[in-house]
């Protein structure tokens, strides 16, 4: 059965640059995939790489897909192209599914609201709460640590008691700064009058797993790995090295969805699913994986990424988005 593959690269601009310890992110580049079989069934997929997390670039994904031509199904996607593995496998899964369009976007209470880095988080947090989010995520390691810890203390004073806060350092802290942050987090988490800090995400670079394990054992506040576990291979490696803290998983850059689901079902890890700032096409596939891998009660989904771009693509269906490009 012939399956035709069509590709559409895209670029979309953040309304405001996303500030993280990796630096400002202004443009999200990606690649949409459309498959159609001889029966007229269609499947969409998305390649949404994050090269600074270790994935391939859009150019590498495009070169691979174009080089395959009509033979694209006869060659396995190399492990070095995890975002391409996700995109192609998701598109094939949708093509084979009876009807992918029974789609239900999760409610805001099930989604973690994303706050801008810096002091602006103080003004945006109430808006996220008003939108229904009860878990919020704040990027740290962007401004001087004394300023950020000062803003943290203001933020938790302003949040309702049932709020949960995730702090994401994107591997940008030194060991001393990570300890400074964990002291500040434990001070909040031992005060029953304040909101809870759910975890400190990727405090150190991925090559410092031993230090992060020690931090996890030395403080009350949990540590989550993100950049350390970007692919299924890295998930398995950290698991095999004994990591039992939180695993933040971005399905769009993790590689094969089937392999990811197998890892989840085999090990039942403490998982938080996270967006790669993909479009509706990648989002639906990633959230479908999260739904299959997250036993209730699941932690809030790290998919508060809609509305961060300067376009209206988040309001479109996959077919409408494909036609728009
Ligand atoms: O995880 C979330 O809640 C939202 C997604 C998110 O924070 C990220 C997506 C992609 C790259 C990073 O800037 C960032 C992260 O590090 O988790
Ligand atoms: Mg992160």
Model-identified regions with their sequence ranges:
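Short helix-capping segments at alpha-helix termini
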Residues: 158-163, 187-196, 218-221, 294-295
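N-terminal capping/lid subdomain adjacent to the active-site entrance of alpha/beta enzymes
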Residues: 1-166, 170-172, 176-179, 183-187, ...
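A short, flexible N-terminal coil/short beta segment enriched in small residues
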Residues: 75-91, 195-201, 206, 212-213
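Long, low-complexity, intrinsically disordered polar/charged segments
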Residues: 104, 108-109, 182-200, 238-248
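Catalytic beta/alpha-barrel core
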Residues: 114-116, 136-145, 164-171, 193-208, ...
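Generic structural signal for hydrophobic
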Residues: 127-128, 152-155, 181, 185, ...
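Shared catalytic-loop signature of beta/alpha-barrel
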Residues: 67-71, 208-214, 218-222, 229-325
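Active-site-adjacent beta->alpha loops and helix N-cap segments on the catalytic face
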Residues: 119, 142-158, 173-177, 204-217, ...
